[in-house]
């Protein structure tokens, strides 16, 4: 997994360094809301942190294992949060656009509508459509 220096900009796009943005969540702190969790999960994809991605995935939909781009061919280019919606006291949805490139290919834009649930005080990724 790539490492981030404490003063490196956070991959999630917020104007903070990694150590004060997504770093604490990757180290085990609970995200305060669904958007923050989604941003931390994006940063985990950038860092190829499968352990965090699995830990932040709700047990009811979590896969047994997760295969990321181990060859390092995917370059994540940026994240834009388009909409965050609290759908209930313990549920939320986040729509975002992620940009990436595989190898020397053209940049790709991916839009995802993710659902999140709060369980025992922690937010988890549930699924996407």
Curated annotation (Swiss-Prot):
Disulfide bonds: none annotated. NCBIfam families: PRK04233.1. It comes from the Bacteria. This is UPF0225 protein XOO0286. Gene3D superfamilies: 3.10.450.50. Belongs to the UPF0225 family.
């Amino acid at each position: 997994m790539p490492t981030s220096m404490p003063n490196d900009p956070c991959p999630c796009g917020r104007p903070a360094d990694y150590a004060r943005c997504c770093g604490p969540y990757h180290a085990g702190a609970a995200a305060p809301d669904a958007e923050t969790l989604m941003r931390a999960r994006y940063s985990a994809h950038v860092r190829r942190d499968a352990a965090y991605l699995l830990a932040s995935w709700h047990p009811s939909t979590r896969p047994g294992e997760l295969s990321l781009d181990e060859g390092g061919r995917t370059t994540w280019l940026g994240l834009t949060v388009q909409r965050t919606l609290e759908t209930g006291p313990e549920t939320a949805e986040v729509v975002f656009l992620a940009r990436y490139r595989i190898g020397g290919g053209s940049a790709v834009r991916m839009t995802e509508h993710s659902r999140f649930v709060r369980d025992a005080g922690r937010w988890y990724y549930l699924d996407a459509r």
